[in-house]
Curated annotation (Swiss-Prot):
Residues 1-29 form a transit peptide. It is an enzyme of class 5 (isomerase). This is Peptidyl-prolyl cis-trans isomerase F, mitochondrial. It comes from Rattus norvegicus (Rat). It catalyses: [protein]-peptidylproline (omega=180) = [protein]-peptidylproline (omega=0).
Amino acid sequence: MLALRCGPRLLGLLSGPRSAPLLLSTTRTCSDGGARGANSSSQNPLVYLDVGADGQPLGRVVLELKADVVPKTAENFRALCTGEKGFGYKGSTFHRVIPAFMCQAGDFTNHNGTGGKSIYGSRFPDENFTLKHVGPGVLSMANAGPNTNGSQFFICTIKTDWLDGKHVVFGHVKEGMDVVKKIESFGSKSGKTSKKIVITDCGQLS
């Protein structure tokens, strides 16, 4: 499941905040991007994920990738969104969703949290831990321990500062946090989703 450390099967993310532990645990596409905030760079890529649940559209999530801080990690995610390497996120699922924590996706090989791969090979090292898990909408890499980044990622729905220094933050939601909340509503304490949540399309906006 997630890369929040739990051994070789990418089962991490089973532990919640210290103060409140969890019980369970392609081409590029042009469209309107989100408004850029003061902490955004006009040079950073904007990508999108179109998401559905049991075949019904939920909407679009637009993400800014912080290429100005973590260029290698941002490029991995960007290319997996466009599918330009011949593989990527389109058709994969949000396989693990824990309300009041995070929504995890990116395993496009096994679809259960045990697979996925990066554009650099199976895994690549932690780039840096400059960006922090400061609140809802943070985009971060899942892993199975240090230097095991692949394609799995998660979007936080709360501040998750206990993950700082363990997971590489590389972006944030620019538009569509309401869609993230819809995804979150189909989750459970175990992470199992009540509906099949699929990335029906994805790509790059700018």
